[in-house]
Amino acid sequence: MPQHKSAEKRVRQSKRRNARNRVHKAEMKKLVKTVKGLIEKSAEKEEVENAYRAAIQKLDRMAVKGYLHKNNASNKKSKLSKLVNRFSKGDAA
């Protein structure tokens, strides 16, 4: 238990931030999982590209806002684009 007022405030702040981070990371994971699922199901190319665009936008937003390190976001985007490109060429992963 915190002994000082400032430590109590830090606990409150970290709980709030942790909850916010969890929401954003869960949404990001859901979008990435959607893209991978569509690729596995061999869905329409247009549908995969729309899901891919949404995932990339979310990753970019998370990097700008500081929820995710920019290199981490870049790495995730790179892996996702490699999957999508392979899918669009006809080599379903």
Swiss-Prot record:
One of the protein's GO biological processes: translation
Keywords linked to the UniProt accession: Ribonucleoprotein, Ribosomal protein, RNA-binding, rRNA-binding
An annotated GO cellular component: cytosol
Protein name: Small ribosomal subunit protein bS20
Keyword Thylakoid appears in the UniProt entry: no
One Pfam family matching this protein: Ribosomal_S20p
Free-text function comment from the UniProt entry: Binds directly to 16S ribosomal RNA.
Region Disordered: start-end pairs: 1-23
Comp. bias intervals (Basic residues): 12-23
Record bears the keyword rRNA-binding: yes
Basic and acidic residues: bias regions: 1-11
InterPro entries the UniProt entry points to: Ribosomal_bS20, Ribosomal_bS20_sf
Recorded family membership: Belongs to the bacterial ribosomal protein bS20 family.
Molecular function (Gene Ontology), one example: small ribosomal subunit rRNA binding
Signal peptide region: none
